[in-house]
Design a protein with these regions (language model features):
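Short strand-coil-strand connectors
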Residues: 50-51, 193
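Conserved catalytic cores of phosphodiester-cleaving nucleases, focusing on short active-site segments
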Residues: 54
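Short hydrophobic/aromatic beta-strand or adjacent loop that forms the aromatic wall/cage
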Residues: 16-19, 42-46, 123-129, 153-159, ...
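Non-catalytic, glycine-rich low-complexity segments
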Residues: 167-195
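Metal-dependent phosphoester-hydrolase catalytic domains
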Residues: 32-33, 63-67, 75-85, 91-169
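Structured beta-strand-rich core segments of catalytic domains in phosphoester-bond hydrolases
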Residues: 1-50, 138, 143-148
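Acidic/histidine-rich helix-loop elements
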Residues: 11, 60-62
Length: 195
């Protein structure tokens, strides 16, 4: 079962326009944060889970608004002690001042060398997945890629696969034991919950 959430930013064409989030896990907490945008209002949705926090946003087209948004996001997330991920359309190229400022506190996990926009023939990288450096522990990036899907949106989807660390007591099913001691050596055996 999937859980869907929507944080509207503006009224649009008889409905609402904003940020959506679809999760497998049920969040412990959901919160939205309005962000500046002179061309249109912007927003961020924060979903807190047992082991991490995930934020999704769509930043302004103007650098000044993005910089103000980044300050709000940093203040909004500064008290987090869990790994925190920030994803979305940042409307900024990798060499922009905004991305350089973002990288002071966040580590980009997605591949900024792969273009994401426009979807039919991407020429720009403006979509990212990043993690707050102060809490970037307990996981490793397995892969990061842009998915070849030109029709679902005006941006290509990005995917970052992570492997989370498991505590030893969750990996080992039993205490290690000695088996078949022979000659000058022994074999230590144990059962685990991982392949």
């Amino acid at each position: 079962q999937m859980h869907g959430y929507f944080a509207p930013a503006i009224d649009y064409d008889g409905g609402k326009y904003g940020i959506g989030l679809l999760t497998k896990q049920l969040p412990l907490r959901l919160q939205t944060l309005p962000l500046p945008g002179r061309e249109e209002a912007r927003t961020l949705i924060l979903a807190e889970f047992a082991d991490y926090i995930y934020c999704c946003t769509h930043m302004s087209l103007t650098e000044e608004d993005r910089m103000k948004s980044l300050e709000l996001v940093k203040a909004f997330t500064s008290s987090s002690t869990k790994p925190l991920f920030l994803a979305g359309d940042m409307n900024a190229e990798p060499e922009s001042g905004f991305i350089k400022e973002l990288q002071k506190d966040f580590q980009i996990l997605s591949n900024p060398k792969q273009h994401t926009f426009p979807a039919p023939d991407p020429k720009e990288t403006i979509d990212y997945i990043a993690t707050l450096k102060q809490n970037a522990k307990g996981f490793a990036v397995i892969s990061a890629k842009v998915i070849n899907e030109p029709m679902a949106s005006d941006h290509r989807p990005i995917l970052v696969e992570l492997r989370t660390a498991e505590k030893a007591d969750k990996i080992f099913r039993m205490k290690p034991y000695l088996q078949n001691p022979v000659g000058n050596g022994i074999t230590v055996m144990w059962e685990t919950t991982v392949p």
